[in-house]
From Swiss-Prot:
UniProt keyword annotation of Coiled coil present: no
Major subcellular site: membrane
Disulfide bonds: none
Gene Ontology biological-process entries: meiotic spindle organization
Protein name: Uncharacterized protein C1739.04c
Length: 274
């Protein structure tokens, strides 16, 4: 009775360790290592379990470019593993291999005489595809584990892997639709360009085309006249400024010349002998 709480405690510890991992995804080897730490005794008695866990985990990383497991998928795998361990503890830990040898050597009708009261050691696996009355009996611990693990896949679908695959398909569909739209738009633009080129090259013109050309010609003439007027105004302004500037410089030069001439006369008159 105490084994179930113990298994649940181990699974909770595993979930806690996975949640504390710094990176968002883990490798299958890391998952196997964590399981091996907590379930070393189970792996020792059933060495084939690691291979089966790795095989099932590889299905969850097919769509991942780095072949890594999301934390949620890793927790789902651990949950399925713990469910198998809890529901079939006798099968996975203490089944006598001699019984299985006898089973393989016996016919189907002799199964009840071989196992007698120990027939409960073999789990009965129900298939969702069949009715509740149609069951099958597993012939070995490995088959029981694999079957139970496969059955658990119906209960813990790889949600993240599934949604990633679905969204990638949706994204590819949208990309193809967008590319198709772009090609359609490009072809339409090319057709319009060709039509415009052909209409320009046509010698016969409609009255509307003539009016349009006249309007464009008048607007271009107006723009040219406006540009010429603006340039002439700017040039006249520049010239007037230059004239004023030259006049000021000339006045300053004349004033300086007169001042120097007057001062030189005064100096010469002072230096004459009396």
């Amino acid at each position: 009775m105490n084994s179930v709480p113990n298994e649940l405690t181990k699974s909770q510890e595993l979930f806690g360790q996975i949640s504390k991992i710094s990176h968002s995804k883990i490798s299958i080897s890391e998952l196997i290592t964590l399981l091996d730490i907590h379930y070393s005794e189970l792996f020792t008695k059933n060495p084939w379990m690691k291979k089966e866990v790795r095989k099932l985990a590889s299905e969850f990383v097919e769509n991942d470019p780095n072949h890594l497991l999301s934390k949620q998928d890793a927790c789902h795998l651990i949950e399925a593993f713990v469910n198998v361990s809890i529901t079939s503890p006798t099968l996975l830990t203490s089944v006598d291999p001699v019984l299985y040898q006898q089973l393989e050597a016996s016919s189907t009708n002799d199964i009840s005489t071989v196992f007698e009261d120990e027939s409960s050691s073999l789990p009965i696996i129900l298939h969702p595809k069949f009715s509740s009355m149609q069951v099958r009996t597993v012939t070995s611990p490995k088959d029981a584990f694999v079957s139970a693990f496969e059955e658990n896949k119906f209960h813990f679908a790889a949600t993240e892997s599934f949604f990633e695959m679905a969204f990638s398909k949706i994204d590819s569909c949208l990309t193809s639709v967008q590319s198709t739209k772009k090609d359609s738009i490009k072809s339409r633009l090319v057709e319009r360009y060709i039509q415009n080129e052909e209409s320009v090259k046509r010698p016969d013109k409609s009255p509307f085309d003539t009016m349009t050309e006249a309007t464009l010609q008048s607007s271009s003439d107006k723009s040219e006249n406006f540009t010429k007027t603006l340039l002439s105004n700017v040039l006249s302004t520049i010239l007037s400024v230059q004239v004023i500037f030259a006049t000021v410089i000339a006045l300053i030069a004349i004033s300086v010349f007169c001042f120097l001439h007057t001062s030189s006369k005064t100096t010469s008159s002072k230096t004459r002998p009396s």
